């Protein structure tokens, strides 16, 4: 083994070997239990971020554990075509490089261009996945637009249409006026904005008056331009101010339209004036109110979000309607929406109908890709009827076929699924799965797997012209089929039989509805077991939190606080990090602040920590709470942990290589410490496996850390030294054998979390361990608890030995006694502890650096001593001649004064009403905790003074 641990030199070559040897593949023995995980397919445009690294570490740890249990494991890998994101990347590329738009290319040539881009640049994320040590089966890599998945998508669409679960309708969607497409709620970012609330007077028709004698009512709005499309005003039916007006009309200013006043719970009596203008074609809440009261829908905007020359009027079912005229005032024709807002407010003011304008904080929806304000827009789109599909999907979670970890996320899932809306699945893009629907010139629609099939099924002559729907399917539609589409469906393949349903889905809470719920609905509708029972896509959904920065803020390019996992593996210098965080920014004005913060936080850039340290940190932080604040200090700590394991392994090798390790015929004797470390290992194996089974990777990592660092390195290796130096041959064989076998088992136990370092060390020690065969640690067995190796007595006895040694070390530190000075020690002990002392004398003398140790006779007088309790015994160190009494008292007086000063300072802080009133609860609690600590220290110091004064 190399002298120092250098992850850079071992990781990439090792991964290449694993992949080339086919170790990541299922072993194919179907008589053994199978285990599968389908990776959430990352966007093909993407690069690996901390969220991916976190979830991939969790998945890889789980898959490596199950592979080492001998299961037939598949970790299915693949990428998502990411419709809108990919199309925009390529549009920007051709604009920058060729000054062209997609329209200059035309649809087919532009799509070819995207495929070309995918071939060149689409592999970034899969390369990075390899760097993480992800043991996915690369030979089975899939893409959501490959032939097999495209076939599955088409099949699902056609069957859903035939089952009357897909329809085309005119409904309200999130419309991106820049990208000219419908987008999902997940692609809408609500930004806090300072805006205004305009209060308009709407005159009452037919001489009607309000309860207080006014001939108008006042409505409040944050979007004045939409009033051109108003078809009603809502008041709360319980509101005494307006009850008499329900059923009456108002005359809408500017457009002179007569619209009704309706009673609806949507109007909040406490909010604003209690009267709400209703624009069903341009607001999601109003759309629902409009449906409840059969109010016509008037669309006033073009797809660019300019005012139309003539409005479009529809019934609540989206059919054309003549309930109102289509005229809009000429001066607004073609006007941009925000310019129209200003002009309409000015016209209300001129008409004397602007009651007041108030400052108002509101959330404005922006498209996260196009960066412009989203408009709710009435458009023709394709929809899935989700209610019938949701019923089965809810039952699967209710009856435990699918379990959420943590369980609280089931409630989030239920609340969505019990109030599920129809799902808009069409997008006005070119890149994606084109909708398999064709139209004739009369507007009749035909759905089928191909134009030939459509003509055949509907007896359409070749003279009848058909044109395919221009739209593509929402990316979530194809990714909803991920668990079964990747395994060969609609064919009934062996893979589908063996690996479906998958065992666990690891995902974020933000896509439980968009992806998880839809996978459950689609899978259960299309995949049935041999008894015809709907199959679930996965048995467990493990929901992770978000990884935030050290201050708890979300990582984002605009905040400049994004950490790239690869930079933590390989390291990055400060200038490159600053450039990375400030280059190509959407908002360049933020660059200076980001640069300042980056230089402050990472003075020397980021050093190379290696993959294992990163993985261990991610695992150790994977508690099942919501969010995780990233901490570079923990990463550094876990790199030190890897280093410690490396150095411990070198110590083991130096003491076992070319030595008799007790695998031959020679006599063998195991020390108490040998039996103790074996027992500690069994406890660690039991705890590790339990934690993995319960998805508590944080506790599993902690178990490894605690065992390797504290028990194996800090204690056991120390306890072996007296035996290796002075023990008999039989004792040395026993200890060498224990050293090498426990290390080998430990490497296997830790391998799923830190694969590279464990494989590297294992390859070096493998020849020293009897009976270990095989080319890689990956395919060795994962240690399980073995009662036969567990010895409670050895555990208790060594805990006593540890307590004895620790007490001596603590007393040396407390009384400032030179750590190397041999001490005389006396023990007031019962029979059991006296026997322990006798049995372990050699180890205690060596590790505690003692001159002598003896048990006191009953009633024996003792001189002034420093004392400590060890179990039921009292340990004593006679102090005479050990220290300079006056110097030690002077030192202690200084410590006492310093501690009293701290106590006074904190008491003053906590006694200050201003501080207590303003400071957060957590800060106050921390100060109280500090105070308690100082008070305990003071009591100890006084005790030490008394002991020394008595000498």
UniProtKB/Swiss-Prot annotation:
Under Enzyme Commission nomenclature, its number is 6.1.1.9
Reactions the enzyme catalyzes: tRNA(Val) + L-valine + ATP = L-valyl-tRNA(Val) + AMP + diphosphate
Motif 'KMSKS' region: positions: 554-558
Q: Where does ATP bind?
A: 557
Q: Which GO terms describe its cellular component?
A: cytosol
Q: State the Pfam families in the record.
A: Anticodon_1 (PF08264), tRNA-synt_1 (PF00133), Val_tRNA-synt_C (PF10458)
Annotated keywords: Aminoacyl-tRNA synthetase, ATP-binding, Coiled coil, Cytoplasm, Ligase, Nucleotide-binding, Protein biosynthesis
Q: Which GO terms describe its molecular function?
A: aminoacyl-tRNA deacylase activity; ATP binding; valine-tRNA ligase activity
**Where is the protein localized?**
Cytoplasm
Motif: 'HIGH' region; annotated at 42-52
The chain's coiled-coil residues are 882-951
- Biological process annotations from GO: valyl-tRNA aminoacylation
Assembly and partners are described as:
Monomer.
HAMAP family for this protein: Val_tRNA_synth_type1
Instruction: Please give the record's comment on domains.
Output: ValRS has two distinct active sites: one for aminoacylation and one for editing. The misactivated threonine is translocated from the active site to the editing site. The C-terminal coiled-coil domain is crucial for aminoacylation activity.
The family assignment reads: Belongs to the class-I aminoacyl-tRNA synthetase family. ValS type 1 subfamily.
Say what the protein does.
Answer: Catalyzes the attachment of valine to tRNA(Val). As ValRS can inadvertently accommodate and process structurally similar amino acids such as threonine, to avoid such errors, it has a 'posttransfer' editing activity that hydrolyzes mischarged Thr-tRNA(Val) in a tRNA-dependent manner.
**Mind telling me what this protein is named?**
Valine--tRNA ligase
Origin species: Vibrio vulnificus (strain YJ016)
Gene expressing this chain = valS
């Amino acid at each position: 083994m190399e002298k120092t641990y250098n992850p850079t030199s071992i990781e990439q070559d090792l991964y290449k070997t694993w992949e080339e040897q086919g170790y990541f593949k299922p072993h194919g023995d179907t008589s053994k239990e199978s285990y599968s995980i389908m990776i959430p397919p990352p966007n093909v445009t993407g690069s690996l971020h901390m969220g991916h690294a976190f979830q991939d570490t969790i998945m890889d740890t789980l898959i490596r554990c199950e592979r080492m249990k001998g299961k037939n494991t598949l970790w299915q890998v693949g990428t998502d075509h990411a419709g809108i994101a990919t199309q925009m990347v390529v549009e920007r590329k051709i604009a920058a490089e060729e000054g062209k738009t997609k329209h200059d290319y035309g649809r087919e040539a532009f799509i070819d261009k995207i495929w070309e881009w995918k071939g060149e640049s689409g592999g970034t994320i899969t390369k990075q996945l390899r760097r993480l040590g992800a043991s996915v089966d690369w030979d089975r890599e899939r893409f959501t637009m490959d032939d097999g998945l495209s076939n599955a998508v088409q099949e699902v669409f056609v069957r859903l249409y035939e089952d009357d679960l897909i329809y085309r309708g005119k409904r309200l969607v999130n419309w991106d006026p820049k990208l000219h497409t419908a987008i999902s709620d997940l692609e809408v970012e609500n930004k806090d904005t300072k805006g205004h609330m305009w209060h308009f007077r709407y005159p009452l028709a037919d001489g009607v008056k309000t309860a207080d004698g006014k001939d108008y009512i006042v409505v409040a709005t944050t979007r004045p331009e939409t009033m051109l499309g108003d078809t009603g005003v809502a008041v709360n039916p319980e509101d005494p101010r307006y009850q008499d007006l329900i059923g009456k009309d108002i005359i809408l200013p500017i457009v002179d339209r007569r619209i009704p006043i309706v009673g609806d719970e949507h109007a909040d009596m406490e909010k604003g004036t209690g009267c709400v203008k209703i624009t069903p074609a341009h607001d999601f809440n109003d759309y629902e109110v409009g449906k409840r009261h059969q109010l016509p829908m008037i669309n006033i905007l073009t797809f660019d979000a300019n005012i139309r020359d003539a409005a479009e009027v529809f019934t609540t079912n989206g059919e054309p309607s003549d309930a109102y005229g289509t005229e809009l005032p000429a001066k607004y024709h073609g006007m941009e929406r925000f310019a129209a807002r200003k002009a309409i407010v000015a016209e209300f003011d001129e008409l004397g109908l602007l009651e007041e304008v108030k400052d108002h904080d509101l959330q404005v929806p922006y498209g996260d890709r196009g960066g412009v304000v989203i408009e709710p827009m009435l458009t023709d789109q394709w929809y899935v009827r989700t209610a019938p599909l949701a019923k089965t999907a809810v039952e699967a979670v209710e009856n435990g076929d699918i379990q959420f970890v943590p369980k609280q996320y089931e409630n989030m899932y239920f609340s969505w699924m019990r109030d599920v809306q129809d799902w808009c699945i069409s997008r006005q893009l070119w890149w994606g799965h084109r909708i398999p629907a064709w139209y004739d010139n009369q507007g009749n629609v035909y759905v089928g797997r191909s134009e030939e099939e459509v003509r055949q099924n509907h007896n359409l002559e070749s003279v009848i012209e058909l044109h395919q729907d221009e739209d593509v399917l929402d990316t979530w539609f194809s990714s909803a089929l991920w668990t079964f589409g990747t395994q060969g469906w609609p064919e009934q393949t062996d893979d589908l039989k063996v690996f479906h349903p998958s065992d666990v889905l690891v995902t974020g809470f933000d896509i439980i509805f968009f992806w998880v719920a839809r996978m459950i609905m689609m899978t259960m509708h299309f995949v049935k077991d041999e008894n015809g029972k709907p199959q679930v896509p996965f048995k467990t959904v493990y929901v992770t939190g978000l990884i935030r920065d050290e201050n708890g803020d979300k990582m984002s390019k605009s905040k400049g606080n994004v950490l790239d996992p690869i930079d933590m593996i390989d390291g990055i210098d400060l200038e490159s990090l600053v450039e990375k965080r400030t280059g190509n920014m959407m908002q360049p004005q933020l660059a200076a602040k980001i640069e300042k913060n980056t230089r402050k936080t990472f003075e020397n850039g980021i050093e190379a920590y290696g993959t294992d340290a990163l993985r261990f940190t991610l695992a150790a932080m994977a508690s099942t709470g919501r969010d995780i604040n990233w901490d570079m200090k923990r990463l550094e700590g876990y790199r030190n942990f890897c280093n410690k394991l490396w150095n411990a392994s070198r110590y083991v090798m130096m003491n076992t290589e070319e030595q008799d390790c007790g695998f031959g015929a020679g006599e063998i004797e195991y020390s108490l410490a040998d039996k103790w470390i074996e027992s500690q290992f069994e406890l660690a194996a039991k705890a590790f496996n339990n934690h993995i089974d319960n998805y508590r990777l944080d506790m599993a990592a902690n178990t490894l850390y605690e065992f390797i660092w504290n028990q194996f390195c800090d204690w056991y290796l120390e306890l072996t030294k007296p035996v290796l130096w002075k023990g008999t041959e039989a004792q040395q064989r026993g200890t060498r054998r224990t050293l090498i076998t426990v290390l080998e088992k430990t490497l296997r136990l830790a391998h799923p979390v830190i694969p590279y370092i464990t494989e590297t060390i294992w390859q070096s020690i493998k020849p020293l361990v009897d009976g270990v065969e095989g080319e890689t640690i990956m395919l060795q067995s994962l240690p399980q608890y073995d009662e036969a190796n567990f010895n409670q007595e050895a555990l208790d006895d060594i805990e006593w030995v540890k307590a004895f040694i620790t007490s001596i070390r603590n007393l040396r530190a407390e009384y400032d006694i030179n750590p190397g000075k041999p001490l005389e020690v006396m023990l007031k002990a019962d029979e059991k502890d006296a026997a322990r002392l006798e049995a372990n004398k050699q180890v205690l003398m060596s590790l505690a650096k003692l001159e002598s140790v003896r048990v006191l006779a009953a009633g024996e007088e003792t001189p002034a001593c420093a004392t400590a309790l060890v179990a039921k015994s009292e340990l004593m160190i006679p102090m005479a001649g050990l220290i300079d009494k006056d110097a030690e008292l002077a030192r202690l007086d200084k410590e006492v004064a310093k501690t009293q000063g701290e106590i006074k300072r904190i008491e003053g802080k906590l006694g200050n009403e201003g501080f207590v009133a303003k400071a957060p609860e957590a800060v106050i609690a921390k100060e109280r905790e500090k105070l308690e600590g100082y008070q305990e220290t003071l009591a100890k110091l006084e005790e030490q003074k008394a002991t020394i004064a008595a000498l």
